[in-house]
Each structure stands twice: as C-alpha cells, then as structure tokens.
C-alpha cells in the first residue's frame, strides 16, 4: 500500500465536459445536479465523455464480536445467513444489481465461521470476526492493513475484468457500531450525534450501544491523525476492505460509488490514508443513520438522493448506477445547438 499513488482529479476533462454540456441542445445547466455528476465523472476518469459498460459491486462480509453485547436487532449468525443468501442471488443487493446490470462479488474477509461449502464466495478471510472494541482493539494494525489490501486487490481484479464503475457493499451484523466510532473519532462529533438505530433497535438499546462505543473509544484511544490506527482499534474487517476498494479504484481512475453510513465510514478511512481519494469518490444517497450526513459533510462528498434507506449492502450505491448511465449518455448521445440549426 505504501507505493499506491492516487492520480489527481482532471480539471481539464471536467472543464471539457462542462463546455460540452453547455453546448448541447437544451437550456444551459437545466439538468442541474445530473450535469454536476457528469462533470465529476469526467474529472475522475480523465475523459470528457466517460462510459461505464461494465459495472460491479463488491460486497465484503465480516462479523463483529461487539454484536454479542446486544447492539443489533439480530444475532451474529445472520451475517452468515445473508452471505449464503447473497451468493444464491436472493438479497436486496442482488435484485438491485440485476436491475442496474451490475455484477456482484461477495467476499468473506472476516466472517466468524469458515464457509468452505459456499459456492461462488470469494474467500479472502483475514480473521474470524473483529474483536469487541469495547474491551480492546478490534484488530491489530497488521490485520487492518491486510484487510485494506484485500480491497485494493479486489479493485485491481475487477479492473482486469473490464469493470469501469465500482461500489463497495457490506454485510456484518453490528457494523454500525464501529462505523459510529470511526465517525465520532474522525469528525469530532459526539457519539450520540453519530449513533442511530442501525438494524432497528429501540431507543434504550441505542443508549446502550452509544455507551459501549464511548467506552471503546476511551479504552482504545484511537489517534484521529492516523486513519489506520482508528481502523484497527475501533473498525472492522469489511470496513477496512471497503476502504481498500476505494483506494484501489481511485488509483485506477475507476469511480467508486459510496453507499450509506458504513461505506461513509470506510470512505473516511480511505481519505485519511490517501487524501486524494476524496475527489475520486461519488456519493449516492443520504442515509437515515444520523452519522451519515455528518460524515459526508465532513468529507465534502455530495449525495444525490434521499429515499430513507438504512439497509447497507451497497443498495443505495447501485441505485445511482442508472442515473450515472443517464448522465454520461447526455454527453455521448445528445445533439448540439449547432446540430439542430441554432446559432
């Protein structure tokens, strides 16, 4: 990872795309934020007219032993159940990927049990669940970096298959707790401000969850100036791998679409490791989780819609894929003012 370089956002390509948009057969700037999205995609890819015929979502799965303390509405075993469901095509993310024409890869980076019998699963297990960070570090620094490398490697493998648009998804019961911890440490917001209902827990359990997060931060004392330290002490394997996918995608000029709260926490880690990643990411939706918009505002990454989502899996990110297709089709398929006879 030390040799990973992030290319600069191409102002030249972005400006060329904006000039092209302004000369198309429509009222100037009349497509609003769709045009902003097209310009951002041009700058990320370095191409005036980018295209994304091959799209992918990489979903990283891991468990969290803090889930054993009742921070989630379901038990830790649901992570494995959903992984098995995803590889069979039965999840929300599967349906949304089919709708968007995107391929889904499901990667075991830290599920509690071994899943040797699961066909179609990408096996990159670094550990058998993150440790309970309310009692000590979730991972060693070496484990965290190994998980980040899994994500970088997956970005490279997807690129080798011809993928030009990526999103990072996740499955991990209890993973809003490390996401809240990361958000609090990196943004300076209070734990209460960034801790929500997650999988649908009642208010008294939200308070319990926030208390555990506060204790974990106090015990581990993560250094906000060292993103890997934060990741190792209060993060988790799938968060690390997601940040790696963002780092890897950015290094290859592949736009990576950021999903909701957990992906936002992973983005904060990726940007902490390589600040240039910020300009190479695409926001998607504003999550119901209170910490999400705090994170995205802190990172300076705009979001494009609010459907009241809080599922994760990469579902909000892949919903943006058809809008991305529409944005780039404007650049490549619309006629110009001159082309319709206007002077």
Language-model-derived ranges and their functions:
Residues 1-343:
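N-terminal loops that bind phosphate or other acidic moieties
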């Amino acid at each position: 990872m030390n040799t990973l370089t992030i290319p600069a956002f191409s102002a030249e390509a972005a400006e060329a795309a904006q000039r092209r948009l302004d000369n198309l057969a429509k009222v100037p700037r009349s497509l609003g934020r769709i045009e902003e999205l097209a310009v951002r995609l041009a700058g990320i890819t370095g191409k005036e007219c980018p295209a994304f015929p091959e799209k992918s979502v990489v979903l990283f799965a891991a468990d969290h032993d803090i889930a054993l303390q009742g921070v989630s509405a379901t038990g830790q075993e649901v992570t494995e159940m959903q992984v098995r469901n995803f590889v069979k095509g039965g999840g929300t993310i599967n349906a949304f990927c089919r709708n968007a024409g995107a391929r889904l890869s499901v990667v075991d980076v830290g599920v509690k049990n071994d899943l040797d019998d699961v066909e179609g699963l990408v096996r990159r297990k670094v550990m058998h669940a993150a440790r309970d960070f309310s009692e000590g570090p979730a991972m060693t620094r070496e484990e965290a970096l190994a998980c980040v490398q899994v994500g970088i490697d997956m970005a490279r493998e997807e690129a080798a298959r011809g993928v030009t648009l990526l999103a990072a998804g996740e499955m991990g019961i209890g993973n809003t707790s490390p996401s809240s911890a990361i958000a609090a440490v990196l943004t300076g917001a209070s734990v209460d401000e960034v801790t929500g209902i997650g999988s649908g827990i009642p208010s008294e359990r939200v308070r319990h969850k926030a208390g555990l997060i506060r204790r974990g931060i106090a015990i581990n004392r993560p250094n906000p100036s060292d993103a890997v330290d934060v990741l190792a002490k209060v993060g988790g394997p799938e968060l690390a791998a997601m940040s790696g996918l963002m780092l890897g995608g950015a290094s290859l000029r592949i736009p990576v679409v950021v999903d909701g709260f957990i992906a936002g926490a992973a983005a904060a880690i990726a940007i902490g490791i390589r600040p240039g990643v910020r300009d190479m990411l695409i926001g998607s939706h504003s999550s119901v989780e209170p910490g999400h918009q705090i994170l995205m505002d802190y990172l300076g990454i705009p979001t494009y819609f609010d459907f009241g989502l809080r599922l994760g899996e990469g579902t909000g990110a892949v919903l943006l894929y058809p809008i991305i297709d529409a944005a780039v089709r404007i650049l490549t398929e619309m006629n110009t003012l001159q082309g319709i006879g206007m002077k």
